[in-house]
């Protein structure tokens, strides 16, 4: 009986073994896909942010302190790399434009224009910028903030003919080399006009500017309640004569009587890559 049981067990094991050997080998497990590389930091889309409403902007003008040039030359040579590292850190949330004002302005050597969808992101960049060697030796001489908005007055609905003129005017000059930042503040009389009265004033304001739009690019930022001004006007041009004539035409419109601030400061600078600007101001005394 014992022998028979052993034989049955042995036969069973052989049957199991035979079944395993007789079956085809299982397919190999598929190789694991390599881990995906982290996505590269994607910079803010410049064209998109410059044309969108609701975007925050910070303008700040700076004067280099004379004691910056007491810093060792080797350290000043590294200033541009340090600033560029800050730009790289924040490139997903801000775009930064730089302008050299030294030689044009008494109270500044350069200014920055920072755009961001979130005001906190612009502030974070500026805080980090001021912590660089170059930033620590740059005193802020003016600071203005604002936001972009859709057209308030010369829109398709309110003023279709002028809107068509604005939309059809395309900059056709050489690449702009110069930029202007001009703050504007209106008086209480302006804000107490009816919407229809302000629309009429703005139509009178807009009409004489149309011939200059082929020579001068412009952008408007709204600051009421955000700063001590109502608007920040920004212009780019390669034709300073055309810009001067544009300003003369604006000075002659009735709407100018509502201004309590136009400029003060008016800041003129040359458009510069920020790396070049830092190198220029770090090497020269």
Curated annotation (Swiss-Prot):
One of its GO terms (molecular function) is heme binding. Its cofactor is heme b. The active site is at residue 218. Disulfide bonds: none annotated. Heme binds at residue 205. Induction: Expressed under aerobic conditions. Significantly increased upon shift to anaerobic conditions. It is an enzyme of class 1 (oxidoreductase). It is found in: Periplasm. One of its GO terms (cellular component) is periplasmic space. Homopentamer. Belongs to the chlorite dismutase family. Catalyzes the heme-dependent decomposition of chlorite to O(2) and chloride with high efficiency and specificity. Used to detoxify chlorite, a by-product of the reduction of perchlorate, a primarily anthropogenic pollutant, in perchlorate-respiring bacteria. This is Chlorite dismutase. It comes from Ideonella dechloratans.
